[in-house]
């Protein structure tokens, strides 16, 4: 159908990889890893499957150093951003009910982490969205 498989996984990295690898052998499809909070190793194994990996506000949290480091090294053409509203509001709004307008804080954090402009990173993630989902006509 061309519609990507959207995966939310926690504490099941091995099982998720095994399932995705097995299914990709049967038929190729696009993958989006929603609200990624997994390990660096897991991220790069997902990238080997050409997955897109989405960052939520969690990446901005003070205790998310390892996650931030992982996103710093994920190729720009494989990153998306999301709010996961109404949960996981980014710093500086952590603890509040999340909403779509708060995504700018996650984009700002990641653009600074990757040392590129907010505008450029916004363009990159928008292009990634259309690469994954198509033009949505």
Positions of predicted regions on the chain:
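Divalent metal-binding pocket/active-site signature
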Residues: 1-49, 62, 69-70, 74, ...
